[in-house]
């Protein structure tokens, strides 16, 4: 039986260089993550990890917040080098002194190594102490000119494998404008201009997932024309969302009550996008009127 390999990324570097954003990015990439892991506990922790999946992935922030960091890190890394079944890399995040000072001033935090309160003194001491670790690192990322989004994209490019690259997911949902626009929607489209099945007694109590309503909505010429334009707009931009490191794209289709037109459009959009992408379908307000009637 082939032994499963554990993939580990040790995230470290200068305070204020972006380790919090980095560890969140690794979580989005499918890694199990821990922030502020004491170096001395790392070998024991790896021994206790119960490997349930092929090629498990861990990303751990190990930095100077642990008081014993500088005295323990080298011995721990030497031990990891000799551990069977472990593939580990060190990601070192850095930034220019001027940028680090600006970030500390913006957050009004004090540097942990600035005994006299001068941020720059703490940065210089930390840089000196971390120099050997930086030289050992397989991946060094300078975040001076990077926004959080750009850092996420950089890490996705460096640490995504083929499986992770395909983990981009699309959520297609319907909703009713009368109940508010979904706050997590990335793209919102309004189909209230289309003929409304609500005004047909035989369709009023059905929804867009029911065939009579779906056919009524989608068989109108203006519906087909709009849908083709909608699909032509959405499909070409999906690779760009994936490339920038976005893990979930939420597309919301809205009509007045969220029961008929938007549901039908969301249903058809899911059918077409599912041919090439991982897509989930949801209808936020589809059954809202039914629930209201049942309460009365």
Swiss-Prot record:
Single Gene Ontology MF annotation: GTP binding
Key words of the record: ATP-binding, GTP-binding, Nucleotide-binding
Against InterPro entries, the record matches this protein to: P-loop_NTPase, RapZ-like, RapZ-like_N, RapZ_C
Annotated signal sequence is none
Binding site residues for GTP: 63-66
Q: Which domain of life does the UniProt lineage start with? A: Bacteria
Between which residues do disulfide bridges form? none
| NCBIfam families documented for this protein | PRK05416.1
Q: Which family does it belong to?
A: Belongs to the RapZ-like family.
Purpose: Displays ATPase and GTPase activities.
Q: Which PANTHER family match?
A: RNASE ADAPTER PROTEIN RAPZ
Which protein, by its recorded name, is this? Answer: Nucleotide-binding protein SPH_1680
Q: Which organism is it from?
A: Streptococcus pneumoniae (strain Hungary19A-6)
């Amino acid at each position: 039986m082939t032994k499963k390999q554990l993939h580990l990324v040790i995230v470290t570097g200068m305070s204020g260089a972006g380790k919090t954003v980095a560890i969140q990015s690794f979580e989005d990439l499918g890694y199990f993550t821990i922030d502020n892991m004491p170096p001395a506990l790392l070998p024991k922790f790896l021994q206790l990890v119960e490997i349930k999946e092929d090629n498990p992935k861990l990303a751990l922030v190990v930095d100077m917040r642990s008081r014993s960091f500088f005295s323990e890190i080298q011995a721990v890394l030497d031990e990891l080098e000799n551990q069977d079944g472990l593939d580990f890399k060190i990601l070192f995040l850095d930034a220019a002194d001027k940028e680090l000072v600006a970030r500390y001033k913006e957050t009004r935090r004090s540097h942990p190594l600035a005994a006299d309160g001068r941020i720059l003194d703490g940065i210089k001491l930390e840089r000196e102490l971390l120099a050997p670790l930086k030289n050992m690192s397989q991946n060094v990322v300078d975040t001076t000119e990077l926004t959080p989004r750009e850092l996420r994209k950089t890490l996705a490019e460096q640490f995504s494998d083929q499986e992770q690259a395909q983990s981009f997911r699309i959520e297609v949902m319907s909703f009713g404008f009368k109940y508010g626009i979904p706050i997590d929607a990335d793209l919102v489209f309004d189909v209230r201009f289309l003929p409304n099945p609500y005004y047909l007694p035989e369709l009023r109590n059905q929804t867009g997932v029911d065939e009579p309503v779906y056919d009524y909505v989608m068989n109108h010429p203006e519906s087909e024309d709009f849908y083709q334009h909608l699909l032509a707009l959405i499909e070409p931009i999906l690779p760009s969302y994936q490339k920038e490191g976005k893990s979930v794209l939420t597309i919301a289709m809205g009509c007045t009550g969220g029961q008929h037109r938007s549901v039908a459009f969301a249903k058809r959009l899911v059918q077409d996008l599912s041919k090439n992408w991982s897509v989930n379908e949801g209808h936020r307000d589809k059954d809202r009127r039914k629930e209201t009637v049942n309460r009365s």
